[in-house]
Regions:
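Ferredoxin-reductase
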Residues: 1-48, 161-168
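Gly/Ser/Thr-enriched, mixed-charge loops and adjacent short helices
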Residues: 40-163
Length: 169
């Protein structure tokens, strides 16, 4: 058993960052990435937020596939919900921009693909001063990349000129 910090939903790079931020031994993400929800998979990060070796990933997959990983209730770790992850990850993202950078005066269409960025993405861009038109920000667990995101770039192609935005992301 291991102790777990539950921090989602957060985009995959956010989990990599928070793994390092919290000095965790490793991070785990359940993600459909740029696919539809049926293609959800598991991604693992090492304590530095980097990708695990292929060998270690295969070993974990074998253990999960065998169904042999069992523990008594006394051996289980604890799970704790952490609530500051979005604020911290948003702060980190903003800090990667040049000091004093602002998006003020820009009209931006932001397509979050009904995925894990649906909260942190709009807040980040709005806090940086953008006039924001968010789309794909209503996830229900089954609509990731459904008529939005990477599977439907036409949503941005139509929305950006339709609202006279400066750009679409």
């Amino acid at each position: 058993g291991v102790d777990v910090k539950l921090i989602g939903p957060l985009p995959t790079p956010g989990i990599a960052y928070m793994t390092r931020y919290f000095s965790c031994d490793f991070g785990v993400v359940i993600s459909a990435s740029h696919n539809l929800y049926e293609d959800n998979g598991i991604k693992f990060f090492d304590g530095n937020g980097g990708k695990l070796s292929d060998e270690l990933e295969h070993e974990i997959e074998r253990e999960i596939g065998n169904g042999t990983v069992t523990r008594s209730s006394r051996e289980l770790g604890r799970a704790v919900r952490v609530d500051k992850q979005r604020t911290e990850y948003q702060r980190f993202c903003a800090a990667t921009l040049a000091a004093g950078a602002s998006l003020e005066g820009l009209k931006i269409v932001l397509d979050c693909a009904n995925g894990a960025a649906y909260k942190v993405g709009p807040r980040l861009f709005a806090d940086l001063g953008a006039e924001l038109i968010p789309v794909g920000c209503s996830p229900n667990g089954r609509n990731i990349n459904d008529s939005c995101g990477s599977t439907a770039p036409q949503l941005l192609q139509l929305t950006v000129p339709g609202v006279r935005a400066d750009l679409g992301i």
